[in-house]
């Protein structure tokens, strides 16, 4: 009997239906020689620093860097029951093999392997690796199960990624939070992404617009000079041309063709969904995941933009489904070969609607899912269509010794552009003229313009920058060393927003991503190794090398550890930066646990370090029972001296009042108080 473990219950149910596992039990299904169970995403996570050393519950600079000799995973309490079920199933004598049916990617591999290892299982692993949740795809996948050993490199890559994120997050967050007195959540991949945004805003702020001038003639069509810096020069040319005639110097007409874009991978689809539909990258991924589980589109977390060669015969059927989704006609000619290239497919092929999508009632889908499915369908229709062909005409004329140029465009065959949702306004067609022909000038005018600054990042353009590690004009065939992966980039952006480092700000129809003052301040104080997009991209590249078995995991982890040791030993706080991280609240003292500032809020006195749980509650029963209030001055005295006098305390036993001193007691996890008298 085989035990199949999926990543979530909904996927397990789809697999069980195909395998004939119809008998329901607590936490699993059974039948047809299979037991099908599930995780709830990550059932286990890397343990907190205090699990390795209780002293590390308190944040101190002296304890850094924290680098465990071996890492431990712990099961989340709310997921313990399902873990216990999986462990029990793995230990059944009837179970001979365990099938990893978690998400076919790095994180799915880690989810399964962590549970497998924590359960102490040593039974053979088989791997289900599919790109569609359709019944036929599941059935075919089980007929071609692969050895789990084939994915040991993927597991090691995932494990190294998790450990590296833990090490950088724990150490850098504590180090810079303690150094600058405010919680600064720092991530291995978050910080360089934030650096891209901060750098762009700096470029915009430093930009000084410069005016420029052109002269435009109306000679039956508009003809224009190049840009000029001096208005006087432009005025002189315009005046010289008024009432004159132009001579046609050259007419160049070239027929050109533009090949269809490749199919969508996750990043390119997220970019178009943001640009065209206004969806965030996380929304698009969520919609795609829902469509995948509904068997309406293929696996979303892919970095490939082609189908495999053996799928060429299925392309016409997929195109029919895509046309049905869009309510559009199929291309007159389907060029299947141009979307198939096994050499350009990594773990999963491009995102396309499935055959099942042809029969779906589009009105029954939520709006977001419906629009994203249509976008993916248009991507397929576009990719298999013929090139867009057009004729470009360039006319050069001379007037008063000055050259003027006019450009026009005529569409010959629309080709793949018939499926574009956004129709770009084409250059107007030009009249037919011949060389040496003379034309009269009806008007000559000076046009004024200004150079424009770089544009703020949107999710569309930030995703492109992350994919290329901030490098512009990267060739399509270049090996990309990007920040994060297609599967993680949307989460990185969302975490930057939720952490208060980035905000979304709408401008007309566009939503820009802008660094907050805190985000800008963080990049100001971070050293190069924590904010370099290129270095982070190189780390991601090395994780891929681990996956391929080209380098040892230990060499990668040693590099991370060495970087953290160097950071702690050599980083010098930047003087004057205390003004960069103001909380806006009045400081009453220093936190006895982590040393950060304690400020007053309506309900109490809180440590500014968000990762520290220290708080003195104003409504504490200790004070209200004595008919006293924890005032700001009392809290300040307790934080400074550990004790403070308290007069006129009410006794619930006697009904009388008395004077005493209150002691602050804190064990690193809980805060308490104790009354002492002058004689005791």
Residue ranges and their predicted role:
Residues 137-219, 253-257:
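C-terminal or mid-to-C-terminal helical accessory/interaction module adjacent to the motor/catalytic core
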Residues 9-16, 33-36, 40, 76-87, ...:
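Amphipathic alpha-helical transducer elements in NTP-driven molecular machines
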Residues 232-264, 270:
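Metal- or metallocofactor-binding catalytic centers and their adjacent structured scaffolds
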């Amino acid at each position: 009997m085989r035990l199949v473990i999926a990543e979530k219950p909904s996927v397990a149910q789809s697999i069980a239906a195909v395998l004939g596992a119809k008998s329901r039990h607590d936490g699993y299904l059974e039948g047809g020689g299979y037991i099908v169970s599930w995780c709830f995403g990550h059932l286990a996570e890397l343990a907190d620093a205090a699990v390795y050393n209780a002293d590390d519950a308190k944040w101190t600079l002296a304890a850094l860097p924290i680098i465990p000799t071996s890492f431990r995973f712990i099961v989340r309490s709310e997921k313990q029951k399902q873990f216990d079920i999986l462990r029990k199933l793995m230990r059944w004598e009837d179970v001979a093999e365990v099938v990893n049916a978690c998400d076919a990617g790095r994180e799915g591999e880690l989810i399964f392997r962590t549970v497998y290892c924590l359960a102490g299982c040593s039974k053979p692993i088989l791997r289900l690796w599919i790109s569609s949740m359709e019944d036929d795809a599941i059935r075919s996948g089980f007929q071609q199960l692969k050895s789990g050993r084939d994915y040991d490199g993927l597991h090691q890559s995932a494990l190294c990624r998790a450990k590296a994120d833990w090490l950088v997050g724990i150490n850098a967050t504590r180090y810079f939070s303690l150094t600058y007195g405010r919680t600064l959540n720092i991530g291995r991949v978050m910080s360089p992404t934030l650096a891209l945004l901060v750098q762009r805003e700096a470029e915009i702020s430093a930009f000084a617009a410069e005016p420029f001038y052109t002269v435009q003639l109306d000679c039956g069509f508009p003809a224009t000079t190049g840009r000029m810096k001096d208005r006087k020069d432009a005025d002189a040319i315009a005046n010289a041309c008024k009432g004159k005639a132009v001579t046609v110097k050259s007419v160049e007409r070239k027929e050109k063709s533009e090949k269809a874009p490749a199919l969508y991978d996750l990043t390119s689809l997220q970019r178009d969904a943001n640009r065209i539909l206004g969806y965030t990258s996380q929304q698009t991924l969520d919609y795609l995941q829902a469509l995948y589980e509904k068997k309406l589109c293929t696996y979303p977390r892919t970095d490939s933009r082609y189908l495999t060669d053996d799928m060429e015969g299925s392309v016409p059927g997929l195109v029919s489904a895509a046309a049905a989704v869009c309510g559009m006609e199929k291309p007159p000619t389907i060029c299947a070969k141009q979307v198939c290239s096994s050499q350009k497919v990594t773990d999963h092929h491009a995102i396309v609607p499935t055959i099942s999508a042809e029969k779906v009632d589009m009105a029954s889908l939520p709006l977001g899912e419906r629009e994203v499915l249509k976008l993916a369908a248009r991507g397929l229709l576009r990719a298999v269509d013929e090139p867009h062909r057009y004729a470009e005409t360039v006319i050069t004329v001379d007037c008063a010794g000055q050259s003027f140029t006019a450009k026009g465009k005529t569409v010959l065959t629309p080709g793949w552009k018939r499926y574009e949702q956004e129709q770009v306004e084409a250059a107007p067609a030009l009249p037919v003229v011949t060389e040496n022909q003379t034309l009269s000038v009806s008007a000559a005018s000076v046009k004024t313009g200004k150079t424009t600054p770089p544009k703020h990042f949107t999710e569309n353009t930030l995703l492109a920058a992350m994919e290329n590690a901030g490098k512009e004009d990267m060739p399509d065939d270049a090996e990309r060393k990007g920040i994060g992966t297609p599967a993680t980039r949307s989460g990185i952006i969302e975490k930057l927003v939720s952490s208060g480092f980035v905000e979304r700000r709408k401008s007309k129809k566009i939503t820009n991503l802008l660094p907050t003052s805190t985000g800008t301040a963080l990049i100001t104080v971070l050293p190069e190794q924590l904010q370099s997009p290129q270095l982070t991209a190189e780390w991601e590249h090395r994780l891929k090398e681990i996956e391929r078995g080209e380098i040892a995991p230990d060499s990668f982890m040693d590099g991370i550890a060495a970087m953290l040791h160097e950071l702690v030993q050599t980083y010098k706080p930047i003087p004057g930066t205390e003004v960069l991280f103001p909380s806006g609240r009045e400081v009453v003292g220093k936190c006895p646990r982590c040393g950060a500032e304690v400020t007053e809020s309506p309900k109490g006195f809180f440590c500014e370090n968000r990762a520290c749980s220290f708080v003195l509650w104003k409504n504490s029963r200790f004070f209200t029972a004595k008919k006293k209030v924890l005032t700001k001055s009392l809290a300040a005295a307790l934080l400074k001296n550990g004790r403070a006098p308290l007069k006129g305390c009410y006794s619930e036993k006697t009904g009388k009042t008395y004077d005493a001193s209150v002691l602050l007691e804190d064990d690193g996890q809980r805060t308490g108080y104790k009354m002492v008298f002058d004689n005791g």
